[in-house]
Structure formats: structure tokens, C-alpha cells
């Protein structure tokens, strides 16, 4: 199916180099991995309801490879391809992938397809893959870091076979709302991404050639005792890669106004929610 040629749509003025540099230090994002694991578990629950037997699976934005083993377990006959734009993430992903090496060799003798896990470094919007070569695209909390999601969807559609399946998750417009509101009390700079609404994603999917897209929303609230821990997790989730972000440190008075605004948002149980 041909992909319509539409002008690219910017989700936000995201600095791709900043994103890649941030995720090139896996230790910085490790404290936030609890959320990716929770979302991954919920995605796998949904995927279990779909009866498919893929031969090639792409984990787009695989990070340090936490989802590769589960995908390999779910589809032992498939070749699992992990792709990420950050070279350091590829190096981190080699550890879980190498644990499957012995099983890969065993399966390759029994199965006609190339079973196992392979790793690629590349952009979500410029896949180093042939057209119609993937049966399942999996992407967990990666899409929102790309400035042109419609371009990413077009690439995923190009790589997928006609009856292929796309399963992805990403942050929505209400994500980090508390942080945006608190910083708005301090200055006029953006301090968090304006994440895309799922209805806009649905339109993009249809425009790029996907049929019958089904999207839904789940709310996950993480609670904190202190504003400092909340802000530390926001940084660990990916920080602020906007080209319009403040350059340099915020003044002490402005920082205190932001903290005071956060404190006003405490819940009845005394916790801060995010």
C-alpha cells in the first residue's frame, strides 16, 4: 500500500541531538525504568489477545533492551530486532541479547526463519530495514521523543507487511501537567514536552496507510514525598529536549516560586502526584 506524501508534522520543536545525547547515558534513565516496565506489562497483556505468529519483530526505541527477552519468549520462532538511535543504548542492550545467544543457535537449527535477537542503531523515522519485512512493530514509550511522529508512522508502515501489527505506547497531553503548571508560575519558558493527543495520532495513522487503528488511554499516577524526587524522575524520564527551553540555570527566586506551586498541588494524603 503506498504511503501518502504529506508535509511533515512537528509534534514539538524537539532537539534530536539533545535526545540522543541524554539517552546515551543509560544510568541517567535507569531510575525511571519502573514506569517503562509497568507500561510494557500492560502492553503485553493486550498483545496476548491478538493471535499472531510473527517471523520478524521490531522493537523500535528498544533502549537498553529490557523488552527484547520478553518478545523473544513470546515469539521464540521469530527474529527480534532491537533498534535505538543512541549507540550507548545498543551497547547496554547487548547484555540481555547475549544471554539468549545459546538459545538463538539452538533455535536456528530447528526453525526455517532466523530466530534470535539482533541490534541496529538508527532513527525511528529512517529505518534501516527493507519494505514489507516486519510482522510486528513494538515500541514502548519512545515515539514522543521524535519531532515528526507522522514520519515515524510512515516508516513503520513501510517496513510492516500488509497484515502486520503495530503496538506502541507513548505519553499523552496530561503527562507532566503538574510540572508544566508549576513552572508556569516561575517563567515563560517551556519545561516539558507538549505531548500529542491520541486523536491526532489516530489521524496520522490513517493518513500514513494504517487500517482500523485502535487507541486508548490509561492514567498512571506516581506519587512522591518530595518535590525534589518528583523533579528527579521527570529528568530521568527524558528531561526537556525542546529547542525553546531555557538556556542556563533558573534564578533562585523563580525556582522557589516553582517549588511553592508544586507544594500547593499536594493530595489529601500529603503526596505529590505526577
Where are these regions (language model features)?
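Conserved Class I S-adenosyl-L-methionine
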Residues: 217-274
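A short acidic, Gly/Pro-enriched loop at the edge of an enzyme's catalytic core
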Residues: 125-136
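Conserved alpha-helix/loop element of class I SAM-dependent methyltransferases that forms part
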Residues: 34-55, 66-70
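Conserved beta-strand signature within the Rossmann-like core of class I S-adenosyl-L-methionine
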Residues: 163-170
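A short glycine-rich, Lys/Arg-flanked "PGG" loop and its adjoining helix->strand segment in the class I
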Residues: 150-162
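Class I SAM-dependent methyltransferase SAM/SAH-binding core
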Residues: 55-127, 151
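Short, glycine-/aromatic-enriched active-site segment of Class I SAM-dependent methyltransferases
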Residues: 173-192, 202-204, 210-211, 216-218, ...
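N-terminal, positively charged/glycine-rich alpha-helical extensions of SAM-dependent methyltransferases
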Residues: 1-31, 36-41
Amino acid at each position: 500500500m503506498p504511503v501518502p506524501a504529506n508535509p511533515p508534522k512537528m509534534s514539538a520543536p524537539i532537539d534530536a541531538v539533545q535526545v540522543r545525547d541524554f539517552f546515551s547515558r543509560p544510568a541517567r534513565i535507569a531510575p525511571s525504568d519502573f514506569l517503562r516496565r509497568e507500561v510494557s506489562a500492560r502492553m503485553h497483556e493486550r498483545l496476548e489477545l491478538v493471535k499472531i505468529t510473527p517471523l520478524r519483530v521490531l522493537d523500535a526505541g528498544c533502549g537498553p533492551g529490557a523488552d527484547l527477552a520478553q518478545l523473544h519468549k513470546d515469539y521464540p520462532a521469530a527474529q527480534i530486532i532491537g533498534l535505538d538511535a543512541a549507540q550507548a543504548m545498543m551497547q547496554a542492550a547487548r547484555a540481555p541479547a547475549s544471554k539468549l545467544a545459546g538459545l538463538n543457535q539452538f533455535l536456528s537449527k530447528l526453525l526455517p526463519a532466523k530466530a534470535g535477537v539482533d541490534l541496529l542503531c538508527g532513527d525511528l523515522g529512517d529505518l534501516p530495514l527493507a519494505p514489507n519485512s516486519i510482522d510486528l512493530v513494538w515500541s514502548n514509550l519512545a515515539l514522543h521523543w521524535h519531532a515528526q511522529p507522522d514520519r515515524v508512522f510512515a516508516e513503520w508502515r513501510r517496513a510492516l507487511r500488509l497484515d502486520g501489527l503495530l503496538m506502541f505506547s507513548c505519553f499523552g497531553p496530561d503527562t507532566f501537567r503538574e510540572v508544566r503548571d508549576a513552572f508556569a508560575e516561575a517563567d515563560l519558558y517551556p519545561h516539558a514536552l507538549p505531548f500529542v493527543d491520541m486523536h491526532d495520532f489516530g489521524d496520522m495513522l490513517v493518513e500514513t496507510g494504517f487500517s482500523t487503528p485502535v487507541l486508548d488511554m490509561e492514567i498512571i499516577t506516581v506519587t512522591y514525598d518530595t518535590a525534589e524526587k518528583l523533579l528527579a524522575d521527570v529528568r530521568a524520564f527524558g528531561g526537556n529536549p525542546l529547542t525553546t527551553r531555557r538556556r542556563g540555570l533558573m534564578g533562585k527566586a523563580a525556582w522557589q516560586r516553582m517549588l511553592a506551586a508544586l507544594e500547593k498541588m499536594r493530595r489529601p494524603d500529603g503526596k505529590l502526584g505526577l
